């Protein structure tokens, strides 16, 4: 029996060492060799912000019409003593980039005489072209200690600081900046 208890304890220690939770503190997020701050319109200037872990950015694109990026993004909320780590995946439909839609507007104008550029805005409001999904999340204190992650309310699993990616919302601007980090241009500047 002693051997069994020892074996179980050894397995637990090995599992914990192979799959450690890597906490991140607010001080670590300031290390520009590991993290880049995502400047976005939702920042209040009160110490909050969003940071992307540079080593986690993955371009998983498989075709020319859509781009797929995965990364870890940290949202800092000082008033709640909270850093929330999100592992996210963004899917970008290049046909729905704003520049691509504007480039094709003249064709629409010839087929639909009453078509105006304002309609493009309405189309983007209905279908932004970016789909964001939270794959995992973890909470930490500002000092980098693990915190119990609060489960999302049923039906709101993908309503976060980073999703859904509705056009002209904060989450859309973050996804647009992530695209620029990978491809060197904003998503809405891509013309196919």
Where do the language-model regions lie?
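Positively charged n-region of N-terminal signal peptides that target proteins for export
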Residues: 1-4
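Intrinsically disordered, low-complexity segments enriched in polar/charged small residues
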Residues: 7-8, 182
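Bacterial N-terminal signal peptides
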Residues: 8-16
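Bacterial Sec-dependent signal peptides at the C-terminal "C-region" and cleavage site
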Residues: 15-23
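N-terminal secretory-pathway/extracellular module detecting exported/lumenal segments
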Residues: 23-87, 91-192
